[in-house]
């Protein structure tokens, strides 16, 4: 499960919008919304890309929360 609050905060801290991130991942805004709201899971490749884009060092704190 994704830590939605922390991911949203990290996106904002990087001066990006959810639309910016969706475009970067080459997915629709709705697809990204579903992922960030834990309706669908992020793919491993998306987690890697997001971590690089947002400077996330510890992926577990955002993407693998129980």
Where are each of the predicted segments found?
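Short alpha-helical DNA-recognition segment
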Residues: 16-34
